[in-house]
């Protein structure tokens, strides 16, 4: 099971605690939707900001979160590739 969370109201004037919760759900701006795994933690976060979001239970699983390389490693790999390209030419 998965939860579809959608930000339906503006979070202007919300406390910093609520803003952190909204960011924790992966919502960045008005109208954003996320498909999240149905866990007690996610349900608790959604309940905390229930006046700003809508919840919908969806059959199937939520997609696995994508992992990103830390910026330092990605930058190093690009620099190595650039140097190799310069040495080749």
From Swiss-Prot:
One of its GO terms (biological process) is translation. It holds the Pfam family Ribosomal_L30. Keywords: Ribonucleoprotein, Ribosomal protein. One of its GO terms (molecular function) is structural constituent of ribosome. The keyword Ribosomal protein applies. InterPro entries: Ribo_uL30_ferredoxin-like_sf, Ribosomal_uL30_bac-type, Ribosomal_uL30_ferredoxin-like. One of its GO terms (cellular component) is cytosolic large ribosomal subunit. Belongs to the universal ribosomal protein uL30 family. PANTHER family: LARGE RIBOSOMAL SUBUNIT PROTEIN UL30M, MITOCHONDRIAL RIBOSOMAL PROTEIN L30. HAMAP family: Ribosomal_uL30_B (MF_01371_B). Part of the 50S ribosomal subunit. This is Large ribosomal subunit protein uL30.
